[in-house]
């Protein structure tokens, strides 16, 4: 009951010592828990059963979480800073072996700055996938020097271009597996989102294991996607991650874009120069996960980093055009040729010609 009350008020678990549980004779059998190397135990409110086991449990939980989440999101910046500090302090109560996952983006910058106020010497990790923007690498390394960070940079052992050739290209997140399968079959293009796992998660997990890291701070926010909101409803602001074999916390779960901007301006934090160049996201420049949308980062890449755009076009150009064409057909809307011309024509007429050829072929087949 105490776990339930705490979860639906704060989205946090209960942190206690194993010895205290033994002293009061409390059994935690059946409860999800995590034990660190310092004798501390974290008790989690159980996640809901799968839909097939109980069709009502998950929607009911989601409804309760969204209601409380709305209250937290209405708080002013000071209130949200207090929530973030509460999440961070709960993690630090559980373990002092903590790292901040820093991508060079605005969200992780705020998460890093908040953590530094509590733990100045916290470990800071950047996973350099080898397809990070050069501006991001320069920015993060300079910040590490200026802020005297306990900074570490790791790289994957796999090559992005070779991996995508073998596994497939990434064009949708993990929550879109059904859509990806349909699109892959329709376009005859191999799709996969395994690059995130192989190029980001694996080297991070190895680093955490080698350095004995037990807790990770992220800049994840629930307002960024429905999948994140549903995941948050299941596990809250501090959870155990099987992927990293660590605790993972979301101190910024209730923050909006406006909150992030306000905090950065309040503390005069230096931001990644990519934002002033028109980018909304500063992750891997070769990632195609937003290529199916008209606000695709590919447009900005084409304008600001034409040499990087050309590398993407040469490697994935024909697959991209087939995917766009097939997506239009799956969603039953006519793809705007002007959109294609704006994105591809300056670099290659052959891509637009390929699209038109496929379009003529489909018309003949339909006739």
State where each predicted segment sits.
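Short, charged/polar "capping" segments at the starts of alpha-helices
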Residues: 133-135, 226, 296, 328-331
